[in-house]
UniProtKB/Swiss-Prot annotation:
This is Cysteine--tRNA ligase. It is an enzyme of class 6 (ligase). Zn(2+) binds at C212, C377, H403, E407. It is found in: Cytoplasm. Its EC number is 6.1.1.16. The gene is cysS. Keywords: Aminoacyl-tRNA synthetase, ATP-binding, Cytoplasm, Ligase, Metal-binding, Nucleotide-binding, Protein biosynthesis, Zinc. InterPro entries: Cys-tRNA/MSH_ligase (IPR024909), DUF402 (IPR007295), FomD-like_sf (IPR035930), Rossmann-like_a/b/a_fold (IPR014729), tRNA-synt_1_cat_dom (IPR032678). One of its GO terms (molecular function) is ATP binding. Binds 1 zinc ion per subunit. It comes from Mycoplasmopsis pulmonis (strain UAB CTIP) (Mycoplasma pulmonis).
């Protein structure tokens, strides 16, 4: 059958077939709401379903049906105020002809319930149909691999599991009056759906994390990257353990440094900040940081910052001066309690809004200037987390005072609660026996440093302790990476599957708890146990943890695996033939890649 690459009508049909070509179910009248390079997305309400037996019924609740292009699954999402229900079908890639989406169903399905329980179903049916329909090995391998991929999507909350993916579509449906229903059961559906969504954002079960972000006036160095790599590991560990997370990482795009760079270069502040924000996003991609949910910028939120300062003013915490507005720290009980005696000497009121004659000016109650640095983070936390207390507020150890102390003071003033349950002050990165700093000129740009080496260095260090970058430290990290690469290649070579058992979860829990020392101790125990016993279950545990750590080398090994598997098999073949000269040629290819 020849597939068409476009959709002709607003409403289409869907047909599901068995492997022998029998049509077993059809959906009539599904509405197309999106068709782009990645997905076709349908909206089902009052669509009619017909079974092979002749039985038919009408869809009685709204749902989305996502058909990723050239993938071996599709996703049905039942929209419910109490929480969406996912039903994922393992299938052939769909084709489109005669105004109909058509696919072959491969029996196994994955269900994800509103409270995030996950279940794999119809495995027995799949095993039965391997015999009845004669599924070839390629189909069986594809199905098992796709299940692993989908479980990984779920663990990382990516793709259609990401919090914004479905909610953005539902927002669009609501705006287009497509969530208005006559039945009593569905009355006020849109209102109830979004009320529950807001409640869920406030729900204590959400693991709430905020990390102070960079000032985008220059390229970031590895010292800047330490906090975000560490927090990404912690957040992904929480996701792996079943927690719903919200991770916010701000971008400071108003600052004296940006203004000075603008004056020197005669390039606008906006162009400078946009340039280095783009560069920062490239570095985040290189370091495989994917857990960040929101990255608010100061320039996009000036009005909100003004309202936030006004709310502090109404409560009597703001003092007007000739050159701006400051926060009265004397009104905050225990302000500076955690400070050293030396720091306490520096305690003073801090600017919420400062008048300025340089750079772009913004208006606060007739005063032209810009917001103070300490207010932006407080506003973002207050706004995005609905005035709730964070689980973790992270940043470099140098932000402890005054930045974090002043954030907390403002939050207490507005909300009568502390800004966070736990502070995470990540240690500094030292180079040439000094803190890595652009002003000292002793930086290693993040784009020039190997991201896997950096992650190994961080994992093998206490989160709050300083790290001294030396050649010896880098070489030690390379040794560990080479060890992990060999283990991971062997895992793939044996066609093993990832493990999500208590042994793996224990190690992931240590990452979530910021106990990197215990994590390394346990992982090395399993590596030693495997090297001694060569038991597949030990290798599976180790490789599952290595995969969780999300190294770049994993992607490369998986990408080249088919080619290197052939090289490995040829090498083994020559060994059996005792043709050691040719065997060594192929062995060297694998050694050069660090795979054996």
């Amino acid at each position: 059958m020849k597939s068409k690459t476009f959709l002709e009508k607003n409403f289409i049909n869907v047909q599901a077939y068995k492997y022998n070509g029998d049509l077993y179910r059809q959906w009539n009248g599904s509405k197309i709401i999106k068709n782009d390079s990645q997905n076709i997305i349908l909206y089902n309400f009052h669509s009619r379903i017909m079974e092979k037996s002749g039985k038919s019924w009408q869809v009685s609740e709204p749902s989305l049906w996502i058909f990723p292009k050239n993938e071996n699954y599709n996703v049905n999402v039942l929209l419910r105020p109490e929480g969406n229900y996912y039903y994922i079908n393992l299938t052939s890639p769909f084709i489109f002809e005669d105004n109909t989406i058509k696919y072959i169903d491969f029996d196994i399905d994955i269900k994800v319930y509103p409270k995030k329980e996950i279940e794999i179903v119809d495995i027995k049916e799949f095993q039965k149909n391997i015999k009845d329909y004669g599924y070839p090995p390629s189909v069986r391998k594809m199905v098992y691999k796709q299940v692993q991929n989908l479980l990984m999507f779920y663990e990382k909350q990516t793709s259609f599991f990401h919090r914004d993916f479905i909610d953005n579509i539902v927002n669009s449906l609501a705006k287009n009056k497509m969530l208005v229903f006559q039945s009593k059961k569905l009355s006020n559906f849109s209102q109830r759906y979004f009320e529950e969504l807001r409640k869920n954002t406030k729900n204590e079960k959400i693991f709430k994390v905020y990390l102070c972000g960079p000032t985008v006036y220059d390229e970031v160095h590895i010292g800047n990257m330490r906090s975000v790599v560490v927090v990404d590991l912690i957040v992904r560990a929480q996701k792996y353990l079943g927690k719903k997370t919200l991770f916010v990482h701000n971008i400071t795009d108003i600052d004296d440094k940006i203004i000075e760079r603008s004056i020197q270069s005669k390039i606008s502040e906006n162009k400078i900040s946009e340039k280095y924000f783009r560069e920062y996003k490239k570095v985040l991609k290189k370091y495989r940081i994917k857990s960040i949910d929101k990255m608010p910028k100061v320039t996009d939120n000036i009005d909100s910052i003004v309202k936030f300062i006004n709310s502090l003013d109404k409560k009597g915490y703001v003092i007007q001066k000739d050159d701006g507005f400051v926060f009265d720290v004397s009104k905050i009980k225990n302000y500076g309690k955690r400070l050293s005696r030396e720091d306490k000497k520096q305690v003073e009121n801090f600017y919420l809004w400062k008048s300025t004659t340089k750079g772009v000016q913004y208006n606060y109650n007739g005063f032209l200037g810009r917001p103070g640095w300490h207010s932006e983070c407080t506003l973002f936390i207050d706004d995005i987390f609905n005035s709730q207390t964070l689980d973790i507020h992270a940043g470099g150890i140098d932000l402890t005072f005054p930045h974090h102390e002043n954030e907390n003071a403002q939050y207490i003033a507005k909300n009568d609660v502390k800004i966070t349950k736990h502070w995470l002050h990540v240690g500094q990165v030292m180079f040439k026996n000094q803190k890595m700093s652009k002003s000292l000129g002793n930086v290693i740009l993040a784009k020039d440093f190997d991201e896997d080496i950096f992650k190994i260095i961080l994992i093998n260090s206490s989160v709050t302790a300083p790290i001294y970058i030396t050649n010896e430290l880098i070489e030690n990290a390379k040794v560990i990476i080479n060890k992990y690469k060999k283990l991971y290649f062997k895992f793939l070579n044996l066609s093993l599957s990832f493990n999500f058992d208590d042994n793996v979860r224990y190690m992931v829990r240590k990452i979530a708890d910021k106990d990197f020392s215990s994590f390394n101790l346990k992982l090395n125990e399993y590596i030693k146990a495997y090297n001694t016993s060569l038991e597949a279950d030990k290798l599976t545990i180790v490789s599952s943890v290595i995969h969780f750590l999300n190294f770049s080398f994993i992607e490369q090994i998986e990408k080249d695996f088919r080619k290197n598997k052939k090289i490995y098999d040829i090498w083994q073949g020559f060994l059996k033939q005792k043709n050691y000269e040719k065997a060594d040629m192929f062995r060297k290819i694998l050694i050069d890649q660090g795979l054996i």
